[in-house]
């Protein structure tokens, strides 16, 4: 997971530096990013077994990106394709087929990537708080309008036909 994440981050930073869209090969690398929920030890400076990885993170990420990634180790667990398909199946059974779709905590955009054929004419909107993750989603799904910020800071209210996703659950306090 660590190496896939680092390859994706390096690819992201290259794309941004070169001001170009992601090629299919770039998107394949970006799609391997899984966040830091499964590997919090990479941020533990006292863990000698992960010292090299911690140094690489600090070298590659800005201080702000590093802190945001470290903070995400508690909640960056992406929804499995099986669960996403089941959610879409339920939505289709309720009669939804096209419209404005919001994913309020979109991660790298897995709900966009698994959008059923019957919903392909929909407009996609996402919000992602984590900077690296949101920027990867923007390159993976350039047709979607993805805001990289907290949902409470967006103007994305009273506009959607469907809000879908699996937002992190926890005792988080938000001031808006």
Label each region the model flagged.
Residues 1-176:
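Class I S-adenosyl-L-methionine-dependent methyltransferase catalytic core
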């Amino acid at each position: 997971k660590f190496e896939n994440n680092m390859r994706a981050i390096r690819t992201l930073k290259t794309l941004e530096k070169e001001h170009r869209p992601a090629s299919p090969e770039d998107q394949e690398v970006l799609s391997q990013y899984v966040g830091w929920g499964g590997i919090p030890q990479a941020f533990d400076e006292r863990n000698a077994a992960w010292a090299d990885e911690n140094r690489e993170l600090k070298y590659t990420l800005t201080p702000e990106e590093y802190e945001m990634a470290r903070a995400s180790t508690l909640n960056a667990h992406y929804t499995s394709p099986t669960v996403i398909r089941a959610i879409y199946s339920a939505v289709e059974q309720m009669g939804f087929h096209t419209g404005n779709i919001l994913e309020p905590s979109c991660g790298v955009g897995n709900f966009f990537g698994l959008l059923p054929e019957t919903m392909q004419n929909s407009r996609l909107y996402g919000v992602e708080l984590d900077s690296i993750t949101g920027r990867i989603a923007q390159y993976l799904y350039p047709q979607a309008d993805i805001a990289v910020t907290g949902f409470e800071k967006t103007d994305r209210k009273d506009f959607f036909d469907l809000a879908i996703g699996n937002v992190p659950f926890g005792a988080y306090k938000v001031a808006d």
